[in-house]
Amino acid sequence: MTEQGPATHIEDPSCAVAHGAVPPPVRERTLVAVFASPVARYLLQYGQDLGFHPILVEPDADRRAAFCQGQSPFRDAEFLKAVPELDGSADLVATDHHRPELGLQLRDALRTEARWIGVLGNPRHPGPHIEMLRELGVADPEVARVHRPVGLNIGSRTPPEIAIATLAGLLADRNDRPGGFEF
């Protein structure tokens, strides 16, 4: 109640989510994590919560089995040996830049129509994927499609923090926003 009369609530569609009305995703989204790792686990788990269809690509059968072992938090996830055919709804993140299969996995990803391809790694060091891809005969314009670093610069140190920063960066890019605190 105010001095002028009863307080009224003004309906604003931008507040719908805060009040429990969750709209369906605007379009199908796929998130591919290449290589089983702690970051991949959080990336796919949080990504699924954000409406992405989760896919893990792990060429090593033992690592793939270990990742899938036990209680899986993933619904309808795919666990594959190689990068599948991807369309423009897919974002792919290589979660281990030390793996010898990195170049081959990225080359295969670059042959798809994936919307976004990135490799985790410290931005102060050159990405090993560049030389790997060149040795495989991948042209420089294609190599340049691979983003590194990935995610927003929030000082991430732990696997969950890295996953959050990565997903925030992907969402900002998908929504044509710079990320950060400016609205």
Annotate each language-model stretch with its function.
Residues M1-S72, D91, H125, G169-F183:
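Segments forming oxygen-rich coordination pockets for charged ligands
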Residues L44, Q105-L106:
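Generic hydrophobic/aromatic pocket-lining and core-packing "Φ" positions
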Residues Q71-D76, E135-V138:
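Short, hinge-like loop/turn segments at secondary-structure boundaries
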Residues A77-G88:
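Short amphipathic alpha-helix with an adjacent loop that forms part of the alpha/beta core around
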Residues D91, R107-M132:
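ADP-ribose/adenylate-binding Rossmann-like module
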Residues A94-D96:
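Short, well-ordered coil/turn residues at beta-beta hairpins
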Residues R99-G103:
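Cytosolic regulatory regions of ion transport systems
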Residues L120-F183:
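Adenosine-phosphate binding glycine-rich loop
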